[in-house]
From Swiss-Prot:
SUPFAM superfamilies: ArfGap/RecO-like zinc finger (SSF57863), Nucleic acid-binding proteins (SSF50249)
Domain of life: Bacteria
HAMAP family, per database record: RecO
Stated role: Involved in DNA repair and RecF pathway recombination.
Region: Disordered, residue numbers: 239-260
UniProtKB keywords: DNA damage, DNA recombination, DNA repair
UniProt KW DNA damage keyword: yes
Species of the source: Sodalis glossinidius (strain morsitans)
UniProt record similarity statement: Belongs to the RecO family.
Gene of this entry: recO
NCBIfam families the UniProt entry points to: reco
Stored InterPro entries: ARFGAP/RecO, DNA_rep/recomb_RecO_N, NA-bd_OB-fold, RecO, RecO_C
Protein name: DNA repair protein RecO
Length: 260
């Protein structure tokens, strides 16, 4: 890749004494793994540049799975994420690192990611609605198509007052059962619109995205969830934003109250 691409750092880890091994999320090639030689050395021009949430222009070379970074420049200052919003950003970064195929075009998802980060950077309330919308966008880009507005059994439009049960790879069918796989027609409509006007629809969105993402994530837990739990434990008298996140995530259906 000789030209410049817009990119964000999803993950970085030390490599040898002075280098970094990076996962980039790029506008044209999706997730790309890049070796930044000497990036940790004291005199490196890249020192402090290769940070998460900083919009970059980058170029690299190489034909193998791991490319060699040739240059990287910040397009602007890093997006100012802190506290709850920072951990939310780390969560979506880890999601992308875990589920995206290597070097696959996700150009539309790149803008969904950028918009989510921009929302988090300017938000003062709970990040939960933005996270749910991003998860739904991610599932759509992964090819996980679900019709929220029609019963998979009859083809009829969903009724707000009825209950529907989710069946993987089939969709939602009318049901009298009430369990973690059950959703009201009103909740399904909220999922289709990406708008969550109350706690019930927000919790329903979280239940659905947890179920839908599970096959992509496997059994390995997300590190960002553990970091987020530690963050909340350190702040027993949480701010309004943290309290809202706990409330929105507190359905107990998947054992991760207060997580993203």
């Amino acid at each position: 890749m000789d030209g410049w691409q817009r990119a964000f750092v999803l993950h970085a880890r030390p490599y040898s004494e002075t280098s970094l091994l990076l996962d980039f999320f790029t506008e044209q090639q999706g997730r790309v793994r890049v070796l930044a030689k000497g990036a940790r050395s004291r005199r490196s021009a890249l020192k402090g540049v290769l940070q998460p949430f900083t919009p970059l222009l980058a170029r690299w070379s190489g034909r193998g799975e791991v490319k060699t970074l040739r240059s990287a420049e910040p397009v602007s200052l890093g997006l100012p994420l802190s506290g709850l919003m920072l951990y939310s950003g780390l969560y979506i970064n880890e999601l992308l690192s875990r589920v995206l195929d290597h070097e696959t075009d996700y150009s539309k998802l790149f803008y969904d990611y950028l918009h989510c980060l921009q929302w988090l950077a300017g938000a003062t309330g709970s990040p939960e609605p933005a996270l749910r919308r991003f998860e739904l966008a991610l599932l759509s880009h992964l090819g996980y198509g679900v019709d929220f507005l029609h019963c998979a059994g009859s083809g009829e439009p969903v009724d707000d007052a009825m209950t529907y049960r989710y069946r993987e790879e089939k969709g939602f069918t009318a049901s009298v059962l009430l369990d973690r796989y059950s959703f009201s027609g009103r909740e399904l409509r909220a999922l289709a619109e990406g708008e969550f006007p109350d706690i019930d629809t927000l919790r329903a969105a979280k239940r659905f995205t947890r179920m839908a993402l599970k096959p992509y994530l496997g059994g390995k837990p997300l590190k960002s969830h553990e970091l987020f739990r530690q963050f909340l434990d350190r702040r027993p008298q949480a701010s309004a934003g943290v309290a809202a996140a706990r409330k929105a995530g507190g359905d107990g259906s998947d054992g991760d109250e207060g997580e993203q």
